Amino acid sequence: MPLMDVHWLIYVAFGAWLCSYVIHVLSSSSTVKVPVVGYRSVFEPTWLLRLRFVWEGGSIIGQGYNKFKDSIFQVRKLGTDIVIIPPNYIDEVRKLSQDKTRSVEPFINDFAGQYTRGMVFLQSDLQNRVIQQRLTPKLVSLTKVMKEELDYALTKEMPDMKNDEWVEVDISSIMVRLISRISARVFLGPEHCRNQEWLTTTAEYSESLFITGFILRVVPHILRPFIAPLLPSYRTLLRNVSSGRRVIGDIIRSQQGDGNEDILSWMRDAATGEEKQIDNIAQRMLILSLASIHTTAMTMTHAMYDLCACPEYIEPLRDEVKSVVGASGWDKTALNRFHKLDSFLKESQRFNPVFLLTFNRIYHQSMTLSDGTNIPSGTRIAVPSHAMLQDSAHVPGPTPPTEFDGFRYSKIRSDSNYAQKYLFSMTDSSNMAFGYGKYACPGRFYASNEMKLTLAILLLQFEFKLPDGKGRPRNITIDSDMIPDPRARLCVRKRSLRDE
């Protein structure tokens, strides 16, 4: 047999084995004895259901919630099965101790943390300690700092506009750049926040991580060491990591003494043992930047789309901002008095959450729930938070949950009995967009302030509208994530004195 034919047979044999192996992996399933949703028929293979979940995840989860609202079910997605816990089980589940569940591990699994450099988050919770103990208590004093950087960012990132000219913009990209600059100020302080290498690295890192993680999710573990180096996104990610370590290392070595009020300095102060290593700190800073920039930017983009689709909210929101700022300027309490703006962001998030499933956990001990359901060790669970927020049982106010009511929550909070409830940053067993319990998103208070500040300044300085003849851009659902359409555009013009 000619040598070429032998090589061809080897390639065919390897390809056939690889296909069969991938199908075998995609066809495997968990041992949890609860209903599975999503199959079109009894004849549909599991591997096809897992693939369909990529673009039909939202409808599959919604179907399961509507059918099994008060009982447990599961969905099959690429890489894992997820047991979906209904609201009436949440308090029982959340009381489990950290040694039984891991909240960060699902993220590491979804995005191939071994290759995307996310494993550092499994080593300790340094980043959470810093956010909870240092950042959150300082939020009121950071308002003016964040506003200073936002004012500067707008001069760099918004297009030049003349007179009454409307300019079409990619608001999604603008939001990423604005939030990147504000976050860099809080993360690195005034001396280093405009480091272009860091700004570029954090923007690229998130994109390369998501692409690499998503591709490797469908690759069997045994083949990942061989496939990962072939991916352009993985090579970009490695460059991003190297760049991030270099920037953070240079900053750490240049800093003298203590007293800096930024996350990097707080992280250095709080670190113990191996946490003190520069590479360790740099990697945590990169992942924190990813979390703080891109989820916030997507939430803000959704809010801008909603605002332009419902322009009747623009003037009431602008009037509120002008009233608060006119009374006392951008003092420490200004953001807390934006009640309508807070409500609008919360309602926008209710319709357009970044994550359809929250409260993600992986159990590392087998346990039995009160109804007798056994949860084996290694099981992943989540809550259908988006589906819940379309259910009248979990959405307050007289307006039906299917209708967008931007002031839904501010109207309820006008009653003094509910003044401190239904805030954008608050979580409870009915609204888990930011998670719930001890392991709710630790940065949600910072993110809330950042978004309220950004939207308030945009309302004061600019006019926005949808392009003529266009409706609100449709969301894109990928797996269990919901993203604003990055191809959509908005029209913007600078406000003038005559607009006052």
Curated annotation (Swiss-Prot):
Compartmental location: Membrane
Keyword Transmembrane: yes
Glycosylated residues, chain numbering: N240, N475
Induction cue: Highly expressed under conditions of Gibberellins (GAs) production, whereas the transcript level is very low in the growth phase.
Enzyme Commission code: 1.14.14.86
GO MF annotation list: ent-kaurene oxidase activity; heme binding; iron ion binding
GO annotation terms (biological process): gibberellin biosynthetic process; secondary metabolic process
Phenotype when the gene is knocked out: Impairs the production of gibberellins (GAs) and contains ent-kaurene as the only intermediate in the GA biosynthesis pathway.
Enzyme class per UniProt: oxidoreductase
Keywords assigned by UniProt, alphabetized: Glycoprotein, Heme, Iron, Membrane, Metal-binding, Monooxygenase, NADP, Oxidoreductase, Transmembrane, Transmembrane helix
Disulfide bonds: none
PANTHER family referenced in this protein's UniProt entry, alphabetically: CYTOCHROME P450, CYTOCHROME P450 MONOOXYGENASE AN1598-RELATED
Protein name according to UniProt: Ent-kaurene oxidase P450-4
